[in-house]
Amino acid sequence: MAGEHVILLDEQDQPAGMLEKYAAHTLDTPLHLAFSCWLFNQQGQFLVTRRSLGKKAWPGVWTNSVCGHPQQGETFEQAVTRRCRFELGVEIADIAPIHPAFRYRAVAPNGIVENEVCPVYAARVVSQVQPNDDEVMDYQWVDLETMLSALAATPWAFSPWMVLEAENQDARQALIDFVARLRG
């Protein structure tokens, strides 16, 4: 999205300024605020997406449904909703925190660094997926149990943040519980 920024964070994870999103993601990316979201359909299937080849970091890599950066004055729920519309063309409901304290630092093969305080959410998709080709090159609906097994067996095939999110036992259980609520 044109004009999108990241909120920079200090050592206490407090806002410390803003920087244009593409300028922020470099070989020495400063700590900044982000979010990650796992989307599910009413049957409890998870939407795994493959990042566009045009992405600056981890192009072509399979990852969780959607990620992004909240903008100044925007709640996480508003940011998740905005990015779901922009990246996947979907409307969502039932946004729930999965791993509010998640943070990570990872270096892509091209040297670009992700360095984020990145709360993780789950949400239910309530419309058809219409991906933005600049963001998503492919997607699949899969059972969560199958996805979690694939992440454990072949972590190299997925984004590092998705792998780390799934490795957290509390986050895994929260995802499983979210799916159980969807399935009734």
UniProtKB/Swiss-Prot annotation:
Provide the GO MF annotations for this entry. Answer: isopentenyl-diphosphate delta-isomerase activity; metal ion binding
Which cofactor names does the annotation list? Answer: Mg(2+); Mn(2+)
Gene Ontology cellular component terms for the protein in this record? cytoplasm
Name listed for the protein in its UniProt record: Isopentenyl-diphosphate Delta-isomerase
Recite the UniProt keywords alphabetically: Cytoplasm, Isomerase, Isoprene biosynthesis, Magnesium, Manganese, Metal-binding
Q: Relate the assembly described in the record.
A: Homodimer.
Give the organism, scientific name: Klebsiella pneumoniae (strain 342)
GO terms under biological process: dimethylallyl diphosphate biosynthetic process; isoprenoid biosynthetic process
Q: Which residues bind Mg(2+)?
A: 87
Where, in this chain's numbering, is Mn(2+) bound?
25, 32, 69, 114, 116
